[in-house]
Amino acid sequence: MAKKSMIAKAARKPKFKVRAYTRCQICGRPHSVYRDFGICRVCLRKMGNEGLIPGLKKASW
């Protein structure tokens, strides 16, 4: 889990737009965030397996 201070810091608008970065909306993780869903790979996998994301299903080939 991310610190509350880091989540608050990320929520502020940066002075320069290139400094902005995505953070998971659920757990606050800063890396591997899928922009389409706004959540990280860990939360995406967990919610996908539980069937909470419509249209998302596990690949099998």
From Swiss-Prot:
Q: What is this protein called?
A: Small ribosomal subunit protein uS14
Upper lineage: Bacteria, Pseudomonadati, Campylobacterota, Epsilonproteobacteria, Campylobacterales
Which positions in this protein are listed as binding Zn(2+)? C24, C27, C40, C43
Matching InterPro entries:
Ribosomal_uS14, Ribosomal_uS14_bact, Ribosomal_uS14_CS, Ribosomal_uS14_sf
Complexes and interactors: Part of the 30S ribosomal subunit. Contacts proteins S3 and S10.
Does the entry annotate any disulfide bonds, and if so which pairs?
A: none
* Source organism of the structure: Campylobacter jejuni subsp. jejuni serotype O:2 (strain ATCC 700819 / NCTC 11168)
Q: Which UniProt keywords apply?
A: Metal-binding, Ribonucleoprotein, Ribosomal protein, RNA-binding, rRNA-binding, Zinc
Pfam families from the entry? Ribosomal_S14
The record describes the protein's role as:
Binds 16S rRNA, required for the assembly of 30S particles and may also be responsible for determining the conformation of the 16S rRNA at the A site.
Q: Give the cofactor note text.
A: Binds 1 zinc ion per subunit.
Domain of life of the organism encoding this protein? Bacteria
One GO MF annotation is:
structural constituent of ribosome
